[in-house]
A protein has these predicted regions:
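Membrane-proximal N-terminal amphipathic helix
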Residues: 47-79
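N-terminal single-pass transmembrane signal-anchor helix
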Residues: 17-44
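Long, compositionally biased, intrinsically disordered regions
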Residues: 104, 146-154
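N-terminal leader/signal peptides at the extreme start of proteins
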Residues: 1-20
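Short conserved beta-strand and strand-loop elements enriched in small hydrophobics
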Residues: 158-167
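Type IV pilin-like appendage domain
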Residues: 81-144
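Low-complexity, S/T/G/P-rich flexible repeat/linker segments used as non-globular hinges
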Residues: 170-187
Length: 187
């Protein structure tokens, strides 16, 4: 059996082009760009879909804020508002709504009673208001100590109010429901 002397053996590296070719580089870049485009398109579609849920939940939270301000007897301009706290919705302004202190006690929103204007997320609009029939405006107020819930359309109160929202990009809809007991639901 012959053993080769390993110490004196020379290893020769063949001179072959060991780099990337232009075609390989272009294919790699194409794959990376394709993966990035797929990720970004799915990400923005998911964001658009979440905007409706976010808008409806924010609206319900703002209704609860008005309810809590009434329960907590929160003052507005150094006195408790006679009509409590409320939220004003109108189809004339479909991208925002107002939290207000009903200082006059008339169950309706006046511009001098405005506490906060809340804009809806991008592409989300109020498509309708209802208290049993379609309305152009709806004021939901909470009067302590119970709090008494008043769902007022400018002429009469009702037992349930609905605010309908729509995502103008995806076409999906949601509804926020408030009843006379103060229960606020998002569907």
């Amino acid at each position: 059996m012959k053993i080769k002397n390993i110490r004196n053996t020379k290893y020769e590296i063949l001179n072959t082009n060991q780099g990337f070719t232009l075609i390989e580089l272009l294919i790699s870049l194409f794959i990376i760009m394709l993966m990035t485009a797929l990720f970004l398109s799915n990400y923005s579609a998911g964001t658009r879909a979440n905007n409706l849920s976010l808008g409806a939940q924010q609206m319900a939270e703002d209704l609860r804020t008005a309810q809590n301000k009434a329960l907590g007897s929160t003052q507005y301009n150094s006195s408790f508002p006679k009509g409590g706290w409320g939220v004003h919705f109108t189809t004339a302004s479909t991208t925002k709504y107002a939290i207000f202190a009903d200082a006059s006690g008339d169950k309706t929103y006046q511009t001098n009673e405005m506490y906060q204007i809340t804009p809806l997320p991008p592409s989300i609009v109020i498509t309708g208001l209802s208290n049993g029939s379609a309305q152009s405006s709806l004021d939901i107020t909470f009067l302590p100590p119970d709090p008494i819930v008043r769902i007022y359309n400018g002429t009469a109160t009702s037992t349930t109010g609905y605010i309908y929202l729509k995502n103008t990009v995806t076409g999906t809809t949601a509804q926020v429901k408030v009843n006379i007991l103060g229960l606020i639901q998002v569907n």
